[in-house]
Amino acid sequence: GKNIYYEEAMRIPMMISWPEKIAPRRDSTLMIAFADLYPSLLSLMGFKDRIPAEVQTFDLSASILSPENTQEIAQPYYYLLPENLTTGYRGLRTKKYTFAVHATNGRTDEWILFDREQDPFQLNNIAPDQPTLIKQFSNQLKDWLKKTNDPFMNCL
């Protein structure tokens, strides 16, 4: 399944063909989540003003159109159980790090942090050795969970 924080599950290529607007054969390091497609595609089609205020994801249309306009975004990651929203994983993925937290019934029981530049195969969980980064990512994640009214925020 794809419900895991490893690169093999998260890093899925995306192809866009729009010869009038996007140069062919352009490679990009832009991180875009499936949920970002909704506001991004609406904006690209000229309906930016029609994106509902309730949309909780990112409009990445400017970054899609211009290779110079890159946004550094920590993409949220979540694996949840619909019957128990305080069990599962939540996390963030940046260009360098993968961060995830696991909780069972509202109790945090695992912290995961991988430096994908130093450990591209994600074999060494560096969370125990990086309390500053864990705190930084936890605060970012908590902000996202508050914004999305996710009860998992009480696990952090």
Residue positions per predicted region:
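C-terminal cap/loop subdomain of S1 sulfatases and analogous C-terminal strand-loop tails that border
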Residues: 1-4, 22-24, 30-38, 42-112, ...
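Intrinsically disordered, low-complexity polar regions and short flexible loop motifs
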Residues: 119
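Generic structural marker for isolated residues within well-ordered, non-membrane alpha-helices
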Residues: 38, 123, 141
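Structural micro-motif
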Residues: 11-15, 38
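Short Pro/Gly-enriched coil loops immediately N-terminal to beta-strands
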Residues: 5-11
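Charge-dense polyanion-binding interfaces
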Residues: 136-154
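Generic recognition of stable, solvent-exposed alpha-helical segments in well-folded globular domains
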Residues: 7, 32-36, 132, 136
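Active-site-proximal N-terminal segment of extracellular/periplasmic enzymes that hydrolyze or transfer
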Residues: 124-132
